[in-house]
Amino acid sequence: NGMLGSAGFSGHRGDVMTGNYLATLKDNPCYVANYNGSRQANSRSVPDINNTMATDLWANAIEQKQTQYKNTIFGNTSLYANQYRNYNYNYEHIGIEVPDGGNWGNSKDNEVCNAVDYPKESDQQFTLANLTAQKILTKFPDKRFQVYAYSTHADVPSASITINKNIDVQLIPTVYQMESSTNGLRNRWYNRFSN
């Protein structure tokens, strides 16, 4: 994204959507949010927030990537000198943002998985972010997390949803969002949250 700040932002977690994770989604379609009547797993799939196994799998995959990367850097600091020196800046935040163009749940499923209506996309985004942060904080209690308020999930979440204090939200009000004017969306966020 190229935005600057006191710490680097991680961006979309497309890196999670490979190998074992994607295979697990394909083997367990109820883990995938029902998008346009389909639970087909692909690189834009997001976890079904109504399925605890799905949200746990997402959080575990991110935690494992973080642990593996940290162990690699700290296991050979001379080989990874630049990454080691810049570790706190680049990895102060653990990215928990779904893949770009994520297929959020929008279709009621009356068959195998559940018959629950999905809330709006920003509610799904921040429900998943809260669950993910809460789970990963048990292993990395000093970490902060990063998500975007962007595109179809740019809107402020419903009043019933709070955002974990360890989650930093990067508001992107000018790209692909249809909620309101850029300043209108900014004002709604700033009036409600300090994340």
Where are these regions (language model features)?
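Catalytic-core regions of glycoside hydrolase
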Residues: 1-195
